[in-house]
Amino acid sequence: MRLLHLILLSSVYAFIPRLNYNSRRDILYAPIMTTFISSSMGKIEIPQHSPPEEVSFQPLLHKGGIYGSQFNVRVVGEISEENCAQLADVLINCDNDAKQIQESENISNVISLHITSGGGALLPTLYICDLIQLIDTDVYTFVDGYAYSSASLISVCGNKRFITKHSSMLIHQLSADISGKFVEIKDKFNNADQLMNNVADIYLSKTNITLQKLAYLLQHEIMLNSTTCLELGLVDEII
C-alpha cells in the first residue's frame, strides 16, 4: 500500500487585538508595530510567466516586467524601483504621442494599463499613482489575473478600472522589520504612519470602501473576487 507523506507547514501569526475603529489613526496603528517600517509593501508571491513568444514587444519595454506597444502597456510580476521608472517613462511617452495625434489627426486615445502583479515597492508605486493623475491622457487599468498589495494601488488610480471575471485583488498593510535605537524606531514608526496615511487616502478617495471596512481589509490577507471588487468600488466594470 502506497504511503502518502504529508508535510504540514505552520505559520505563526502575531496576536491582533480587537479595536474600535473610530478614526483613521486607529486603522494605521492597528498592528503596525509588528508589521512595518520600510518603503515596500508585502507582496503575494505568485509564479511568474513570460509573455507569449508570438507577441512582438518593443525592445525598450522588455526590462523590469514592463511590456507593450503604443497605448497598450502591461505590468507583469514584482513592482520595483527599476520597472516603475520605466513605466513612468512609458506613460509620459504615451501621453505625448496621444497629444500629438490629437492635434494632428483629431483622434483621441487612451492608455490601457494591464496589471498582473503580486505587488512590491511602495514609494515608486505612489509616484505612478500620482503620475496617472498628472498626465493629460486617460489611463484605463485592467486587472488581468491578480493585482495585489501595491499593484492594487496603481489599479484603483485608473480613470476607468476593469477586471476580468475570475481575477482578484488584495489590499493589506505595509510590512517590514523594525530595528535600531529607540529614537530611530520612533522615527521609523512616524514614517510608517505617514505612508499608511497615504495608502489609506488613495483607497478612501478612489473606492467605496468605508474607514471601518478598510481597517478590516488592511489587517487581513483576503483575496477579493471580481464581484466584490465591483461592489467595493475597486473597479468600475467586470469584463
Language model feature labels by segment:
Residues 1-18:
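N-terminal chloroplast transit peptides
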Residues 22-239:
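Terminal-region recognition feature
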